[in-house]
């Protein structure tokens, strides 16, 4: 019995370490998938890339990544629900970004940009984030 009580703290620490490791791996895999999808989308030269979207990536410096990703998912949803544009890729991008974002956020941007510019800037943000991990 004494050995069991001695093993419990060690097992708890081991469990905590492995869950942190798995979470880190999932995060890196999500970032890779987002960047891959953005590479595919930004390589396209169809008319959808010229659509005007809210420039939510031009947020103040003190805006958290989770808030920026939440706003980006809002823009993506508006595109694929109102336009028949690369829906499969935009939905996948939305799903992956949502896993890294706040659940709710407000989007009231006045500035606009093209979808292509939006996706290019989002790709740069994600590549920078990936290089830090």
Swiss-Prot record:
Coiled-coil annotated spans: none
Pfam families cross-referenced by the UniProt entry: IL4
Signal peptide bounds: 1-24
Glycosylation sites: 28, 45, 62, 84, 96, 102
Cystine connections: 48-85, 70-113
Broad class of the protein's primary localization: secreted
Alphabetized UniProt keyword annotations: B-cell activation, Cytokine, Disulfide bond, Glycoprotein, Growth factor, Secreted, Signal
Gene Ontology terms describing biological process: B cell activation; immune response; interleukin-4-mediated signaling pathway; negative regulation of inflammatory response; positive regulation of DNA-templated transcription; positive regulation of macroautophagy; regulation of immune response
Family annotation (SUPFAM superfamilies): 4-helical cytokines
Subcellular location as annotated: Secreted
GO cellular component: extracellular space
GO terms for MF: cytokine activity; growth factor activity; interleukin-4 receptor binding
Database matches in InterPro entries: 4_helix_cytokine-like_core (IPR009079), IL-4 (IPR002354), IL-4/IL-13 (IPR001325), IL-4/IL-13_CS (IPR018096)
Task of the protein: Participates in at least several B-cell activation processes as well as of other cell types. It is a costimulator of DNA-synthesis. It induces the expression of class II MHC molecules on resting B-cells. It enhances both secretion and cell surface expression of IgE and IgG1. It also regulates the expression of the low affinity Fc receptor for IgE (CD23) on both lymphocytes and monocytes. Positively regulates IL31RA expression in macrophages. Stimulates autophagy in dendritic cells by interfering with mTORC1 signaling and through the induction of RUFY4.
Homology family: Belongs to the IL-4/IL-13 family.
Family matches, as PANTHER family: INTERLEUKIN-4
Protein's name according to its UniProt entry: Interleukin-4
Gene: IL4
